[in-house]
């Protein structure tokens, strides 16, 4: 069952991270699988977890970049690096997160993450 307040909060947060069109596309992709799953994504991940107190949004996004690098999930990694840049993370901060990950995730995942990052920067025109 949809929680309207959390849903609105989640939509607002997703728009802040990915831009309204980018976030709308994410939600629509998940809705293809299941409407309730899309609501859960919006309300839980974006409406509850990413809006908690204790860490600012940029720091949360950098934590997500680190986790996705360690897990080797490159498709989501690109999206989260882009989101981190959108909420104020610098290229230097992202590079340092990726470098830090070689200690815990290994060289192959670190280098794969750098490839994702470099391609994203190229696509963003940098």
Language-model features and meaning:
Residues 60-68, 98:
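Short, structured motif recognition centered on aromatic/hydrophobic residues
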Residues 55, 71-75, 106-108:
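Short helix-coil transition sites and intra-membrane helix breaks within transmembrane domains
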Residues 53-58, 88-92:
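Structural motif
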Residues 39-42, 71-77:
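Short acidic alpha-helix initiation/capping motifs at coil-to-helix transition points
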Residues 74-92, 111-115:
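Extended intrinsically disordered, low-complexity coil regions enriched in Ser, Thr, Gly, Ala
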Residues 93-117:
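Preference for long, well-ordered alpha-helical segments
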Residues 1-57, 110-126:
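Acidic, glycine/proline-rich low-complexity segments that act as flexible tails and inter-domain linkers
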């Amino acid at each position: 069952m949809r929680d309207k307040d959390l849903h609105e909060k989640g939509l607002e947060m997703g728009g802040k991270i990915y831009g309204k069109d980018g976030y709308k596309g994410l939600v629509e992709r998940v809705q293809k699988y299941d409407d309730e799953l899309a609501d859960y994504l919006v309300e839980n991940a974006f409406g509850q977890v990413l809006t908690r107190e204790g860490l600012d949004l940029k720091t949360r996004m950098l934590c997500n970049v680190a986790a996705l690098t360690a897990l080797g999930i490159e498709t989501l990694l690109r999206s989260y690096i882009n989101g981190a840049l959108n909420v104020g993370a610098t290229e230097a901060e992202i590079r340092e997160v990726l470098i830090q990950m070689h200690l815990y995730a290994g060289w192959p995942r670190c280098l794969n993450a750098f490839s994702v990052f470099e391609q994203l920067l190229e696509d963003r025109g940098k």
